[in-house]
């Protein structure tokens, strides 16, 4: 099975003035390598289009940090997010798509050709599919969280959970991500406090049932984390219970934020129409404000952030690509 290549790229780095322009023009370049981008690649090459995938700083996308995916068709016992994405990548490569470990910093159109600028190269194509996904939001209202970033404040349990074995931690959120993170952490830590702003969980029933069976996960409903404290690292979090109108403190060694996602569209400002939250504005599901540029997955679909909907939109983008290139 193919493995993802580890990429160390500073996303704030300015464009390299000595970039080399590649000497080939693709029919389509797909920016991003999550379920949307890889599915778009699969269908594009199956339609005999020359396709290249610029994988970005996180090959495989957010799913590679998900322990188990239970709601993707075809896997009766679930599959790890990483293995699901490795399977997709192997499939698209076997079909003939090119993959490059590159991050796009800007896109320009000159005539009928799109120029995609990365750190080292300028790629060229007749059309572009944007599938860069989104990244976990930081909870800006949590006081002192910036002081303890990577010192007990995290947005990725699978990345950082091992640092807190045998300790007490908190997870903020009530959706699928928050419950998945809590379940994963429950296998490592002594206690998980799941801090839920509302009086119910938004996650799917399977995850809710799994959490209910785990004795070391305690759900705190109608609650907000308002402040973290500590010396060199997190040692406590203050909780405001809205129902009882009381503030109290929990001793924890880490706080994991699972409160939604922000689209990775900073490099598209001024090139495509974005909404007030930064998501790509689309019509007919995948068409953007620029002819020949299509968008699919979480970067434009903020209502249904699921692997299956991202993959479906990747297919739709490949169909619209065909209509554009005719």
Curated annotation (Swiss-Prot):
Annotated disulfide bonds: 156-159
EC number: 1.8.1.9
Catalyzed reaction equations: [thioredoxin]-dithiol + NADP(+) = [thioredoxin]-disulfide + NADPH + H(+)
GO biological process, one term: removal of superoxide radicals
Enzyme class, broadest EC rank: oxidoreductase
Residues binding FAD: 55-62, 298-307
Main location: cytoplasm
Recorded superkingdom: Bacteria
Names of the cofactor(s): FAD
Cofactor comment: Binds 1 FAD per subunit.
One function term, GO molecular function aspect: thioredoxin-disulfide reductase (NADPH) activity
Keywords, sorted A to Z: Cytoplasm, Disulfide bond, FAD, Flavoprotein, NADP, Oxidoreductase, Redox-active center
Compartment(s): Cytoplasm
An example Gene Ontology CC term for this record: cytoplasm
InterPro entries in alphabetical order: FAD/NAD-bd_sf, FAD/NAD-binding_dom, Ferredoxin-NADP_redctase_2, Pyr_nucl-diS_OxRdtase_2_AS, Thioredox_Rdtase
Family: Belongs to the class-II pyridine nucleotide-disulfide oxidoreductase family.
Any further remark recorded for this protein: The active site is a redox-active disulfide bond.
The protein's assembly and partners: Homodimer.
Protein name per its UniProtKB record: Thioredoxin reductase
Organism: Borreliella burgdorferi (strain ATCC 35210 / DSM 4680 / CIP 102532 / B31) (Borrelia burgdorferi)
